[in-house]
Protein backbone atom coordinates (compact mmCIF):
# COMPACT_ATOMS: atom_id res chain seq x y z
CA UNK A 1 0.00 0.00 0.00
CA UNK A 2 1.40 3.38 -1.01
CA UNK A 3 1.99 5.76 1.88
CA UNK A 4 -0.02 9.00 1.94
CA UNK A 5 1.59 12.10 0.42
CA UNK A 6 3.26 13.44 3.53
CA UNK A 7 5.87 15.29 1.46
CA UNK A 8 5.65 16.51 -2.16
CA UNK A 9 7.40 14.21 -4.62
CA UNK A 10 9.22 15.34 -7.78
CA UNK A 11 6.97 13.00 -9.77
CA UNK A 12 3.23 12.22 -9.68
CA UNK A 13 2.06 9.08 -7.87
CA UNK A 14 0.74 7.77 -11.18
CA UNK A 15 4.34 7.30 -12.36
CA UNK A 16 5.15 4.99 -9.45
From Swiss-Prot:
Induction: By bacterial infection.
Keyword vocabulary terms for this entry: Antibiotic, Antimicrobial, Immunity, Innate immunity
Keyword S-adenosyl-L-methionine part of the UniProt annotation: no
Keyword Cell inner membrane: no
One term under GO cellular component: extracellular region
GO BP of this protein: defense response to Gram-negative bacterium; innate immune response
Known role: Antibacterial peptide active against Gram-negative bacteria.
The protein's name in its UniProt record: Metalnikowin-2B
Species of provenance: Palomena prasina (Green shield bug)
Amino acid sequence: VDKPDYRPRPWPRNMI
